[in-house]
């Protein structure tokens, strides 16, 4: 029985002495820890959807620490470029801190370094940070094993060659290369379902982790006058090992398919073979050491092609349908119509559950809410329905997305997939009408509770070079209490993704102060009023 419930069954005269005398110290401590209603709700959803993936794709842990330097308590939040209020973006303090964090974490490596990203491989200043860290690790007397994994889109990434990147790393490492064992791979788990790795992780010794939306691409983030705005988070503790276990899951598939060039290209160094269980091999049966008191759910997804379903799951969802999710030519809709897909991609329901757990307000900062249609479905019906339910219940919802002016010629070719913010508000209105059965109620909920804007990071409408602001966050925050930072988008995409859900009012306050408040300060100037709402009436 949970310790905090014992007092209900024990007479008041003896309750305190009985609890103190009989409970283990750890249980007594647990009774005093803050409640975690958001994580509890999400964990229930995960156990229903994907019980068999606990410990490999998702895991809840306590005892974590948001990894910030002593002189900067919010330094666990790693933003690029970090030049709020300056359209010229002359001082990119956030980018410098992020690159320095990469180098310092890797420099501390005694045994293992795990890097994952979307292709191409980390280059420019990102590669320099990796190399500098590895050189420092070797100089300290260590011989780290290193895995670097990128997801490759068919045809688009044919020029991403692991052997070439391995050789480049060896050249830059110089004499230190002899002490570094490399596995470098690109992978595509399903060409027909457009599935490949999309996680962005740096895990060192299973003790520290950095994850979020930042890809290691110099041309998008570093060597440009219009850098992408993005965010990662850093932590230490048991949740870092959870990330390592997830990467072991991806590498297990990668190593098993390394002989199939249609799926995997692999290059190694120093005579090594493919390392499918590097994190597990290093950690063994040793429990992960706590470093703090922050509860975290680590949650990822396997996309399509790694595992068909979780056979231990008894999940039986009522899958909704909507005619406007489909386009003229489309693939099988894994997002809206595939129970088995749900069971091996627990992050999907985890994010819906996070939004559903909100009682007062939701902040969403994303590249998009709508996907590239065709070939993907236009939107996630259950996510939109969850948002509609919150709006109808009087919960305030704020959504900031990348400026639609970033839309590429083929939809996802740029940092936006929509032509207008109306695509989001119109869809929300449609789902509200379906939920309430009443146009007037739907309008009241939408006009009274929604704030919707395209992203800006200064008072100027565009960067100083005239380019639109590109936003690549994958961020959801609720009730100033819990939040998700990772690589998973809210729009349909069937990739391998990973992120952390943290419940900590103190950390959520830092997130609000350092990111959400300045974001809205500037983005509200680009706010959109949904059709049918009085000007300035929203939110």
PLM region spans:
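Coil-to-alpha-helix initiation sites in intrinsically disordered, low-complexity, charged segments
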Residues: 1-7, 37, 56
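Secretory targeting and sorting signals
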Residues: 2-30
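Charged, low-complexity intrinsically disordered terminal segments
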Residues: 31-539
């Amino acid at each position: 029985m949970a310790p905090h419930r014992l007092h209900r069954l024990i007479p008041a005269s003896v309750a305190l002495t009985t609890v103190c005398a009989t409970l283990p110290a750890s249980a007594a401590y647990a009774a005093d820890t803050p409640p975690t209603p958001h994580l509890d709700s999400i964990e229930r959803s995960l156990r229903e959807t994907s019980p068999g993936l606990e410990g490999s794709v998702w895991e809840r842990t306590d005892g974590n620490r948001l990894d910030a330097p002593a002189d900067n308590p919010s330094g666990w939040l790693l933003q690029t470029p970090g030049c709020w209020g300056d359209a010229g973006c002359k001082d990119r303090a956030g980018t410098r801190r992020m690159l320095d964090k990469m180098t310092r974490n890797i420099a501390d490596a005694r045994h293992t370094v795990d890097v994952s990203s979307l292709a191409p491989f980390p280059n420019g200043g990102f590669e320099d940070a990796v190399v500098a860290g590895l050189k420092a690790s070797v100089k300290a007397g260590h011989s780290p094993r290193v895995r670097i994994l990128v997801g490759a889109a068919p045809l688009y990434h044919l020029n991403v060659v692991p052997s070439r990147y391995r050789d480049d790393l060896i050249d830059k490492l110089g004499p230190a290369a002899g002490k570094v064992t490399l596995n470098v791979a690109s992978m595509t788990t399903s060409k027909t379902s457009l599935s490949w790795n999309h996680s962005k992780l740096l895990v060192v010794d299973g003790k520290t982790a950095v994850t979020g939306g930042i890809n290691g691409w110099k041309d998008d983030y570093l060597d440009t006058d219009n850098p992408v705005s993005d965010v990662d988070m850093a932590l230490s503790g048991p949740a870092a090992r959870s990330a390592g276990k997830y990467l072991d899951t991806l590498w297990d598939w990668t190593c098993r398919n390394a002989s199939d060039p249609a799926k995997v290209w692999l290059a190694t160094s120093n005579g090594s073979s493919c390392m499918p269980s590097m994190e597990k091999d290093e950690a063994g049966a040793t429990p992960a050491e706590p470093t703090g008191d922050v509860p975290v759910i680590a949650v990822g997804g396997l996309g399509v092609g790694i595992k068909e379903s979780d056979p231990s799951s008894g999940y039986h969802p009522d899958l909704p349908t909507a005619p406007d999710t489909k386009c003229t030519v489309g693939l099988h809709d894994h997002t809206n119509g595939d129970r088995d897909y749900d069971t091996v991609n627990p992050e999907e329901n985890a994010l819906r559950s996070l939004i559903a757990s909100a009682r007062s307000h939701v902040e969403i900062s994303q590249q998009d809410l709508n996907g590239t249609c065709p070939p993907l479905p236009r939107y996630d019906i259950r996510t939109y329905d969850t948002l509609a339910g919150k709006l109808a219940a009087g919960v305030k919802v704020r959504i900031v997305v990348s400026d639609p002016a970033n839309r590429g010629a083929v939809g996802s070719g740029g940092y936006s997939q929509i032509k207008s913010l109306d695509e989001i508000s119109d869809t929300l209105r449609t789902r509200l009408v379906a939920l309430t059965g009443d146009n007037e109620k739907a309008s009241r909920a939408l006009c009274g509770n929604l704030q919707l804007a395209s992203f800006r990071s200064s008072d100027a409408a565009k960067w100083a070079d005239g380019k639109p602001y590109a936003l690549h966050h994958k961020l959801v925050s609720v009730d100033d209490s819990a939040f998700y930072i990772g690589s998973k988008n809210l729009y349909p995409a069937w990739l391998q993704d990973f992120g952390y859900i943290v419940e900590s009012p103190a950390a959520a306050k830092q997130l609000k102060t350092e990111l959400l408040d300045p974001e809205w300060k500037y983005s509200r100037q680009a706010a959109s009023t949904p059709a049918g709402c009085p000007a300035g009436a929203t939110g």
